[in-house]
Amino acid sequence: MHIIGLLAVLIALPILGILGAWFGLDAAGIDSLRQQMQTVLPGYLVTSGWLALMVTLGVALVGGTVAVAISLFEFRGKRFFSWALLLPMAMPAYVCAYAYTDFLQYAGIVQGTLRGWFPGFRFDVRGLPGAIFLFVFTLYPYAYLLARNALSERGTHLMEAARMLGTPLRERIVRVALPLARPALMAGAALALMETLADYGVSAYFGLTTFTTGIYKAWMVLDDRIAAAQYASALLLFVAVLLWLERREQQRMRFSSVRGHRGDDGGAEARLPVLGGGRAVLAWLVCGLPVLLGFVLPVLILLQLWWGELGRTAQTGFEGGSASLFSFSRYAGWVWNSFRFGGMAALVAIVLALSLCFAQRAGGMSRVSGWLLRGVARLASMGYAIPGSVIAVGILLPVAWLQAVWPAASLGILLTATSLGVIYAYLVRFTAVAVQSVEAGYTRIPASVDEAARTLGSSRGAIAWRLHVPLLWRSLATAALMVFVDVVKELPATLLLRPFDTDTLAVIAHNLARDERLGEAALPALSIVAVGLVPVLVVMRALDTRKN
């Protein structure tokens, strides 16, 4: 019970810190807010709104199209595309931004060729359209994966029934497949939208005026804590609305699954239409372009940048000069910091997740304890949707207030001069990932196992440690892996809370790209992609296992 109470305080503190800043408004703060509403806030609202709207539509369109192609048709190469379409999940949008900025620069081969064909032609990828493009082609796998599962479970039989009734193919897709996949597409688009709102790397690198860049600028540049809290609370409100909408769509998905499951078991396996000739080529293009634009091309660009930088470094000596950041010792330090943060956060997250899930399973609590437990579970599930910059500000605001009231505590130094603050932010944001994995593992352990252990005289601690942990080791390993990878890729919380002179792969890649040193940023960026590939491979294997 003590762990549950501690977890409730830890998760709720950043949210309460942001909301509590509104109670500290004085006349100067109100005047500052009025000025912001007349100057910067409209720009934040317009840019963030357009980005959210277009990314949502783009992710639903691309994810839904490839899900229909993979789930409802047979064509040569389908098995390859079914897992290759997940590869962009390993590519953070800010890493993709570094690659395309170099590839599409004014002096590059692409714009040079286009200007040769069309004199006077020019464009700049570092703008709102470029950001929308990057987010769509790195985040569409969320919608693709959920829509593919929905269509594979229920769509094939309904499409076959519509075909036997003489419905044309186009009408079958529009009137059967798309309505069936709509809740899944909405849920996937909501997840992609949360990732978009939480992004700092793309917005900062492209110079966009979004809420995340506004939070960072208000805190780090203007030293305006009240403004940072106001921006963070506005973003938090938007995320809460998104969570409510996403939960509604998830309920509709479960309702559809219950209704459609009964009819799927009885009949023979439905025959999928086989595509050949021009239709097969079209299917290859539809499925191949997202993989090419969201993963293959950025990786090739980064490899070319790294190879070029490696050649230039070799001419002056691998350790030559203080300007060269490609020394092995520095790179090893960035990797060590990333893995150290990821390992510590993953270890604590699985302990908290196991404690929370075991308490929910064991029951036997008072009414107040049960209410607290449900509240903690709801807060933990909300944590992943909260942007890292919002969590960082929510941590720093109470710390700054406590430091002013109680200077001898040195709490600010403890959180910002050590790894404690950044690990805390990771736990608030990513404990939800561990909880979901452990909950899924507990569904495979019958309650009768616990009853038998209690009959034999085992205590709660013995049941959890000696019985559940061995049975849950796969789920615990998956939870640790997911948290570890998310920590390695996390940028805004790390930028705000990391100890002085402690750079991770994400931070150093951002700093080098910001200084237009893209060749030097390529190796850290590729390392992040390589780490991100691990959970994607796990998902691919799980899908193949379930299919078989």
What are these regions (language model features)?
Residues 141, 159-161, 171:
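Internal catalytic domains of large membrane-associated glycosyltransferases
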Residues 154-157, 445-449:
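Short glycine/proline-centered loop/turn elements that form peptide/ligand docking sites
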Residues 162-163, 453:
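The alpha-helix within a helix-turn-helix
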Residues 21-33, 105-117, 206-212, 254-265, ...:
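Peri-membrane helix termini and adjoining interfacial loops of integral membrane proteins
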Residues 1-26, 39-152, 180-200, 228-247, ...:
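Membrane-water interface segments at the C-terminal ends of transmembrane alpha-helices
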